[in-house]
Amino acid sequence: AAFGTVCTVTASGRTDSGVHASGQVCHLDLPCEIPGERLADALNAHLPEDIGVLRSARAYDGFDANRSAKRKTYRYSLYFSPRRNPLLDRYATRVDAPCDEGALSRAAELFTGVHDFAAYCSSGSQVKTTVREIYGISLSRREGLLDIYVCGGGFLYNMVRTMVGTMLWHSLGKLSLEDISASLREGRRSLVGKTMPAKGLTLVRVEYSPDPFEADR
């Protein structure tokens, strides 16, 4: 509507309902000429308050926000407390138990590399293959939160949330490291943890080569 016609917007990928995004990338083909850096302001003037365009650029020929993506990074945020904190609850999930970062890290190591994540996606998912590559998982502390960063070439529906749930169950003694290894080998849903709530998950980065924002400079 901002440009007097309907434009199709293509995103880097679909996020689960309730999941946040601070680094989502989209592209659209416009029927008019407008400097790339000015597009963000033009769009923000028409968007609701809970959506904002942080920056914009003119993409290079052939760029596609979805197909050109090389890797994505998600962050899942937890806070460990016996009591609910309303200031944290919108973007993090509360865990009523002590935090065992060592156990979380040991479980995370098992996911790194190329694996079949059939046990970690929703049943009935329509995908050609459930094999995915995880480049790395790291843990970081900030302002009462424990952030789990997961970087990979692509993800299945609910995959990151179920991975985090599995890591958490291991830290709570509900699953062994062998259970997690077996879940990747055998695809057995009974060997993984629960799917964590959507509110704790944020898409923080999508990487391209070349980077369309750098190419427009």
What spans do the regions from the language model cover?
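Structured-RNA-binding interfaces characteristic of tRNA pseudouridine synthases
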Residues: 1-217
